[in-house]
Curated annotation (Swiss-Prot):
The chain crosses the membrane at residues 347-363. It is a single-pass membrane protein. It is found in: Membrane. This is Coiled-coil domain-containing protein 188. It comes from the Eukaryota. The gene is CCDC188. It comes from Homo sapiens (Human). InterPro entries: SMCO2/5 (IPR026617). Keywords: Coiled coil, Membrane, Transmembrane, Transmembrane helix. Residues 154-189 form a coiled coil. One of its GO terms (cellular component) is membrane. Its main location: membrane.
Length: 402
């Protein structure tokens, strides 16, 4: 079982190693030194053969190997001033290194806690193991398991840095993709759809996470990164290579889509400029048409004015001509003949009236019985009676209506 979590020399909490009984094979020799603190939790359960070590830290300097120790005692808790200063200087340096890398816990398997430091990191791009070095009291040499754990620590450190870089690039790409989607949505409108994702890259969406608006959650506590760590434990380099290839494909797809969007944007800008030019041309044409219509109205008004003036002038000329021609005809023979014809017509009309009256009075008044009463009023009839009373006969009196 794991012990209580204490603050290790690297500045991070680690569960302590469980205690083991004192060794009696060497005749009261020293206990085995502590193999460090249990590290990376994503590697799953740690075997008892690798993780169960002595709980005691380092032995007190000067104690040597004389005399056995009792279980429950902790003589290694009292350290000399030199070892304490060395450990204090070593701890902040490792803590600063881990803080620079951005990880919340030491990333090395629990079975490899006792790898000693040999002059810094193993290679370029790898981070050193944050656990304290092993004590080689009594001339004990490091086992092959320690060397293997040191190599795995270096590989895991480089892989973690690669995954951290991949995740940061993925996050930046998704942020750029979100911005491009917003721009494309504003460009296309509410009824349009976005371009679908490439079918070979649709499996990469499982590694994405929603953008954190606050941005306070560290990268090490995110679920996709823990999933990548578990997959890293199973297949390290192959998975890293596959991720790099997929990232390269995503970049290429992103560049292609970006070029297509840029072309579409250029075409839209050209269409917008063309529409603006057409609108300007239509406005100018409208102004020209209005000017032409105004000119046509002015021309029509001038034509009507000229026609009216011509008609008035012609009428005046005709009147003047008729007046100048009619004056010398008054004293001519044509005027005398006209007067004679007028006198003749008057005589004929008088004779017709006299003949009609004689016919009605003497011969037959029947045709005029229905015509004369409506034409003559009562007063006219009485006047006619008074005028014709000396000449009236019975027949004529019956003809009159009153």
């Amino acid at each position: 079982m794991e012990g209580l979590k204490t603050l290790g020399p690297c500045g991070h909490p680690h569960p302590q190693c469980p205690p083991t009984p004192a060794s009696s094979s060497h005749g009261g020799g020293l206990d085995q030194p502590c193999q460090g603190f249990v590290g990376w939790p994503c590697l799953g359960p740690i075997s008892s053969a690798h993780s169960v070590q002595s709980q005691r830290p380092f032995p007190v300097p000067g104690a040597g190997g004389s005399g056995p120790t009792v279980e429950g005692e902790a003589p290694g808790l009292f350290l000399s001033s030199q070892e304490q200063r060395a450990r204090d200087t070593e701890g902040p340096r490792q803590g600063d290194l881990e803080a620079g890398l951005g990880w919340g816990w030491p990333l090395h398997p629990g079975s490899n806690q006792g790898a000693p430091r040999q002059g810094g990191s193993i290679g370029s791009g790898t981070r050193p193991c944050p656990c304290p070095p092993l004590s080689r009291e009594g001339g004990a040499l490091a086992s092959p398991r320690v060397a293997l754990s040191q190599l795995q620590c270096g590989l895991l450190g480089s892989a973690e840095q690669s995954f951290l870089q991949l995740e940061q690039e993925n996050h930046s790409l998704k942020r750029q993709n979100q911005e491009l989607r917003e721009q494309l949505g504003a460009l296309l409108g509410p009824g349009q759809q976005f371009l679908p994702l490439c079918p070979e890259h649709s499996s990469c969406t499982a590694l994405a996470w929603p953008p954190d608006p606050a941005g306070t959650q560290p990268l090490g506590n995110r679920a996709p990164l823990q999933l990548l760590r578990r997959e890293l434990c199973q297949g390290q380099e192959a998975f890293v290579q596959q991720s790099q290839n997929e990232l390269q494909q995503i970049r290429l797809c992103f560049e292609r889509k970006k070029m297509v969007i840029t072309e579409v944007w250029d075409n839209v800008a050209e269409m917008h400029m063309a529409l603006n030019n057409q609108a300007t041309g239509l406005l100018n044409l409208k102004k020209d048409i209005r000017g032409v219509l105004d000119q046509m109205e002015d021309i029509q008004l001038e034509i009507l004015r000229e026609r009216a003036q011509c008609r008035t002038r012609a009428r005046k000329e005709k009147q003047m001509a008729s007046m100048s021609k009619g004056r010398p005809k008054l004293g001519s023979s044509k005027g005398l003949a006209g007067q004679l014809w007028l006198l003749t017509l008057r005589l004929l009309l008088g004779a017709l009236l006299v003949w009609t009256a004689a016919y009605v009075y003497v011969v037959n008044p029947t045709p005029f019985e229905g015509l004369v009463p409506p034409l003559l009023s009562r007063a006219t009839v009485w006047k006619l009676r008074a005028l014709l009373d000396p000449f009236l006969r019975l027949k004529v009196d019956g003809f009159l209506p009153f």
